[in-house]
Amino acid sequence: MQHTTFHAFCIAAPRSGEGKTTASIALMRALARRGLRVQGFKCGPDYIDPTFHAQATGRPACNLDTWMMGRDGVRALWDSRAHDADAAVCEGVMGLFDSRDPGDPAGGTADCARALGLPIVLVFNGRGMAGSVAALVAGFQLHAVRMGVRLVGAIANNVGSPRHADILRETLERSNLPPLLGALPRREEWRLPERQLGLLPSEEAGTTAAWLDALAEMAEQHLDIDRLLALTTSKRPEAPAPLLSENVPPPAHGHRQRQGLCFYYEENERVLRSQGMGTRSRFPPLADYGPGRHSA
């Protein structure tokens, strides 16, 4: 059953490593457990985070990249994947205003959010911070206006105590800045496993439904999800026209998928299916098995 309201927002951060992936997964899972159909998105060419989004929501996630796809391409993909959802959550990449070129915002989180008109929730590491949170949020709010995007709230990560959270919240209130929508306490068990070049893929990380549910419960306890939803109500995207496909027998296709060879774009699969490609199967390329029964 489709809810009458639609919510959409972007989770961003001042830089990588602030906790935006954990916050994104926790919110996606919490919203899904509330009975909403949640669609996850990831800014940029990241193969790993969407696998966690898919586990949290039960729906395939997809990438949005204004550098590779252009703004019109991003909007079209957003419409095609979000039109039948109740909430769409887009996780940013790196810092909110980072991009491949300091003079060109293409490919960055802010550019993607601007193309889609998404309000932004800033996740930041609150460890060792008190009154300085006002300068941090004020700076991001000011530059957001310059970049044509809107900051509607913040979430503190690695908060030491309820009193610490209160200090951060009161500071933003007194400074007339976007509100603190929650404060996540320090918990080692909530950390996603990492390696040199980023997070481990979900298959290697061994994430379970119980772990995802624990994140959702953490979000319900420490985040003001109702207020977040009230701040991010949006117009539901319209369903796009289907892609042209030929009325021909669909050929089977396969792709390699195993540890170390599991990176692919979900959107590529959708386009193949829309063009008449039939059954997809995954095969382990390192085993004694080949794609001989496939057309492609």
Q: Where in this protein do the model-derived segments appear?
A:
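Hydrophobic alpha-helical packing residues
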Residues: L27, L31-A32, L172, L272-G276
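Short, structured coil segments at secondary-structure junctions
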Residues: A56-T57, L116, S175-L177, S274-G276
